[in-house]
């Protein structure tokens, strides 16, 4: 369940995630972005998800607002969100984003892989954005292994389903 994709509103996402988790016989993975959030807001969402039995979270940095305004909030990077989720106490299955072709905000290749390895070290798995060359994914996994990171990184695919 996406959360503020493209900088859009995320007002109903938690309610929809909780409803889908309760009403369907398949696991729901809540996307949770940190952009524009305070720590207390995220803790409140995590409390709601834990209380409702939501077990899976994909922790993301998130897109800036579509209008280009300052999103505010207390987070700068997804690693900070992952740390907060791990400290929460609920036993969420926690995924993070990975970009085989490098994160758009990365200053260079080496720092991109170091930050990704750090983020993955706190997660259960990584999930990539879409990519077209499978060699990019294979190279990323090799580079992460060279850094001592062996957390699984799954190729992202798009499944279309309307509920």
Locate the predicted segments by residue.
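Active-site mouth loops of central-metabolism enzymes
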Residues: 28-40, 95-110
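Active-site pocket-lining/capping segments in soluble small-molecule metabolic enzymes
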Residues: 73-100, 105, 147-163
């Amino acid at each position: 369940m996406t959360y503020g994709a493209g900088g859009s509103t995320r007002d109903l996402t938690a309610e929809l995630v909780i409803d889908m988790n309760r009403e369907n016989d398949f696991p729901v993975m809540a996307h949770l972005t940190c952009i524009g959030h305070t720590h207390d807001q995220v803790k409140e969402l995590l409390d709601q998800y834990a209380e409702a039995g939501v077990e899976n979270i994909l922790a993301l940095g998130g897109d800036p607002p579509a209008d280009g305004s300052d999103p505010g909030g207390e987070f700068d990077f997804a690693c900070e969100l992952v740390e907060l989720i791990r400290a929460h106490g609920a036993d969420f299955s926690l995924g993070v984003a990975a970009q085989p072709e490098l994160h758009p905000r990365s200053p260079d290749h080496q720092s991109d892989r170091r930050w990704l390895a750090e983020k993955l070290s706190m997660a259960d798995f990584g999930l990539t954005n879409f990519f077209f060359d499978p060699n990019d994914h294979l190279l990323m996994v090799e580079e992460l292994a060279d850094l001592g990171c062996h957390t699984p990184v799954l190729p992202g695919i798009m499944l279309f389903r309307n509920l």
